Structures are given as C-alpha cells and as structure tokens.
A protein has these predicted regions:
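Conserved active-site segments centered on acidic
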Residues: 1-82, 148-151
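Helix N-cap/beta->alpha junction signal
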Residues: 16, 90-91
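Phosphate-binding/catalytic loops
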Residues: 85, 91-151
Length: 151
C-alpha cells in the first residue's frame, strides 16, 4: 500500500501544486513511484479550476520538473481519512485546514518546512512576494526532507 501525501496552500496554483510535482519527481527519480501517491489542494475557493500560476509554472519548467494538466481544487473534509499526511505551507493554511478538516486526531497535519533544517519557517506565498524562485527552493528543500524522512 502506498503512502498518500496531500499538499495544501491557499489557492492550489503555486505552492501546493509545486510540492506535488516536485515530490512526485523525487519519488520517480528514486524508483519509489509504487510506494507514494501525492496530490494537492487549496483551503480557499478563489482559484478553483485554474491552472498553475504562469510564473510558478515557469519556475518549475526552468528546473525540469515534469508538470501535468493541473486544475486547482479545494480540500474536502473526507480527505482527512484518504491521506496519510497533509502538508501545509504556512500558518494561514493550517488555520483554514483546521476549519475544513476538524481536529487532527491522528497527527497527520504538518508544515512542509518541519522536514528541513529550518523547521519553524514557513513557505511564503509567491503570489504576494513575487519571488517564485525562492518558493521553488523552499518547496524543493521541504520535499527532499519529507521524502528522506519517509524512506
């Protein structure tokens, strides 16, 4: 049975979808695709149906990250049971995850940066900072740490 990881951010057009694609790339590179399944979702409804934000897409392409035909979606309460880990990017994500999913009774909701050497850091939203390269680097670092922790 595979480990199921759900990445979460505000709109599901920058950070969480990048984490999904970066994590899947790392899993494939290590020959572990049969052991993991990653997905992504938003806490908000603002961007539902929209593709990856073009500057974030550009950053992923520049780093040779395989990307698919993504459409933003909102996380559903039922997904708490469907995933082994639910990974947020910042405090706001965690707040709204709590409102949507309810109590984290199984301890499966974590910050992505918990898996790095800066566990108290957050991954800032590049929609606002306009720093898509920094977002990519932080997400890459977090995904690498997460995969190392799980293998």
């Amino acid at each position: 049975m595979s480990i199921r990881v759900l990445f979460i951010c505000h709109g599901n057009i920058c950070r969480s979808v990048s984490a999904e694609y970066i994590f899947n790339m790392m899993v494939a590179e290590r020959g572990l695709s049969d052991r993991f399944r990653a997905d992504s979702a938003a806490t908000s409804t603002e961007e539902i149906g929209n593709p990856i934000y073009p500057p974030m897409r550009k950053a992923l392409i520049q780093h040779n990250v395989p990307i698919g035909d993504h459409r933003a979606r909102q996380v559903r309460r039922s997904e708490y049971e469907d995933f082994d880990l639910i990974i947020g990017m910042d405090e706001e994500n965690m707040y709204y995850l709590g409102r949507i999913l309810g109590e984290d009774r199984d301890g499966k909701i974590k910050y992505l940066m918990e898996y790095t050497d800066t566990p108290d850091a957050e991954i800032e939203d590049p929609w606002y900072t306009r720093n898509f390269e920094k977002a990519y680097q932080d997400i890459y670092k977090g995904c690498k740490g997460l995969l190392n922790e799980l293998t």
